[in-house]
């Protein structure tokens, strides 16, 4: 990992973004980039999709969410911000790009203000991302969002 950076999705890089694939054994844990881009379009007020480049090479995709409620019908549900999607390209994992992306999302949440925690959800299963998120300091909250585990990272711990 030389000098990773985040870039907006543009007309010039959208085809490369859509072509980005995770390892085949991870496809059941994360939606493809094309679905994320469709969700970002539909939820343009709360979604923050970015591409992860190292030099000129596209190595991943990350999408954050800002100020959403998981259970809007629950009056005690608070707005949350966090990591919606993380796709690191097959062959580029284990090089620090995922950590970089999580740190970048954390910094963006901190910059926007109003949050004490970063939220993430993940699908459970062998080979899934739980260990990665726990290593970064996320802790299970005991909640589920659909069929996914909810984890949180206190911003004061970062």
Describe these PLM feature segments:
Residues 3-4, 8-91, 104, 108-112, ...:
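Acetyl-CoA-dependent GNAT
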Residues 152-154:
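Short C-terminal beta-strand
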Residues 115-116, 139:
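Short acidic/polar active-site loop segments enriched in Thr and Asp
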Residues 156-158:
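Short, charged/polar, Gly/Pro-enriched secondary-structure boundary elements
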Residues 118-130, 146-148:
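Conserved beta-strand-loop-alpha-helix junction that forms the acyl-donor binding cleft
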Residues 89-91, 95, 124-125:
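Active-site acidic-Proline motif in GNAT/NAT acetyltransferases
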Residues 94-107, 131, 135:
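Conserved acetyl-CoA-binding loop-helix of GNAT-fold acetyltransferases
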């Amino acid at each position: 990992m030389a000098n990773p950076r985040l870039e907006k999705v543009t007309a010039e890089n959208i085809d490369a973004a859509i072509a980005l694939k995770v390892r085949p054994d991870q496809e059941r844990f994360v939606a493809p980039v094309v679905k994320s881009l469709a969700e970002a379009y539909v939820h343009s007020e709360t979604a923050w999709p970015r591409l992860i480049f190292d030099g000129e090479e596209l190595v991943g995709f990350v999408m954050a969410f800002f100020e959403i409620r998981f259970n809007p019908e629950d009056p005690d549900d608070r707005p949350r911000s966090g990591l919606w999607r993380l796709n690191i390209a097959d062959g580029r994992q284990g090089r620090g790009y995922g950590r970089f992306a999580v740190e970048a999302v954390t910094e963006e949440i901190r910059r926007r203000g109003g949050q004490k925690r970063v939220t993430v959800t993940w699908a459970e299963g062998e080979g899934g991302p739980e260990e990665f998120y726990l290593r970064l300091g996320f802790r299970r909250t005991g909640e589920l969002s659909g069929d996914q585990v909810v984890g949180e990272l206190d911003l004061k711990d970062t």
